[in-house]
Structures are given as structure tokens and as C-alpha cells.
């Protein structure tokens, strides 16, 4: 399958839509990344909500523009809340995104993620090892870290996309986005981004938000990858290491939104 490139014009158009629609994103994400995820969405112009209580999750999933399910710090009560939210999302046609953190390394979360796939996610975002494991091609990864190159996971991503109907995002040095028929590659970013916890998880939240936008969902999701890589490059140029990277990264996301509004 040919891998196309995303144009700057496509990315800018998607960011304009993002800022214009300001999606309300229901983030059922892991405990490690909540603040960073919320700040990433805010910097881009979205509205985050971290609603995790089982008694509220279903109700809020019907209100939100999009739902994120991230299994990074999965527990049985949290799984129950996530299941309720996904069931409601399917019923109310709220697009939802799955981030199958460490799915190849641990059985409980692998079984849970496979169960959730029957509720038809709009998007799935993971590293190469996670996507390959979710597709049933390999059980790999070193915890949350990948042991495979993103390009090696393209066939698995295409298969998973065709089986689920989801847009599948494989992140790495180059990000690949596919609907099973088309594929887009996004270059850029910096290795320092992997030294800060939460950049991938935050991207999943932005992907979820992009699934709520009008237009070509594949292009919108690919644009999310582009914004994050752009911001990462800008932040690295201004920072001295991981500690100073985070505020510069959030500033860079904000500046990107200001540029498309100018």
C-alpha cells in the first residue's frame, strides 16, 4: 500500500476546524498523564473532562463530543466504568478512541481491549508493539515501550483497521495513519519526546477530539500527529532537557493554533 504524506495545508485546515469546534473530550485516561493530557487539549483549543466514576461515565459519554479510553493504569472498577462509557458512546454515536497501553505485555488488559473492539472505536492509537499485539500478530513490547519499528506494524494496522472500521495510528519515529485502504506517514518530532511521560497518551486524546470534527477523519487524525511533532520540534529547540521541554511544548501547541487563526 502506498503511504502518502500530509500537506501543510491539510494540517492547517484541520487545526482551524479543531479550534472552531472546540471538542469536549471525555478522557478516561491513566493516572500518570491526566494533567499533561488536559493541558495539551486546552493548548489546542479543546475542552477536556476527566470523568472516571462508574455512576457518571455513561452519562457523560453521551454529552461529550468524543471519548478516550486509555488502559494505562487499568483496574477492575475502572474497566467497569470504561465499559459503561463505551456502551453509551456506541448508543449515542459518540466517536471513541482506544489507547491500548502495554496490551502486548499483560493478559488482563489484552482481553479487555479485545472486548472493547466489539463496540467499534473510531480510532486506535498505539506504538508498533501495541498495534501488532492488538491485531493478534505478535505479543511484544517491554511494558509501555515498543520493541518494533512503526513501519513493521503497517500491515497489522491495516488489518486492524479493516476488521474494526477504525482509523489506526501507529506512532514512532514516523507516525503512520491508516483506514485499511489509505495510509499517511507523518515525519518529524524529536527523540526527546520519548523522555517525557505522556506525549503518546496526550496524542491519543487529540486523536479522539479529531474524530469529532467534520470532514476527512483520516486527514484530521493524521493532522493531530503532525501538530504534536511540530510542537515537539519547536519545544526541543528551546529547552535544555525533559524538565523544560513540557512548558515549551504546551506553548508551541498554543502558538500553532494562533498561527492558523491569524
Curated annotation (Swiss-Prot):
ATP binds at residues 125, 171. Substrate binds at residues 50, 198. The keyword Plastid does not apply. Its cofactor is Mg(2+). One of its GO terms (biological process) is thiamine biosynthetic process. GO terms for molecular function: ATP binding; hydroxyethylthiazole kinase activity; magnesium ion binding. Keywords: ATP-binding, Kinase, Magnesium, Metal-binding, Nucleotide-binding, Thiamine biosynthesis, Transferase. Pathway: Cofactor biosynthesis; thiamine diphosphate biosynthesis; 4-methyl-5-(2-phosphoethyl)-thiazole from 5-(2-hydroxyethyl)-4-methylthiazole: step 1/1. Gene3D superfamilies: 3.40.1190.20. It catalyses: 5-(2-hydroxyethyl)-4-methylthiazole + ATP = 4-methyl-5-(2-phosphooxyethyl)-thiazole + ADP + H(+). Pfam families: HK. Its EC number is 2.7.1.50. Belongs to the Thz kinase family. Catalyzes the phosphorylation of the hydroxyl group of 4-methyl-5-beta-hydroxyethylthiazole (THZ). This is Hydroxyethylthiazole kinase. It comes from Escherichia coli (strain 55989 / EAEC). The lineage of its organism: Bacteria, Pseudomonadati, Pseudomonadota, Gammaproteobacteria, Enterobacterales.
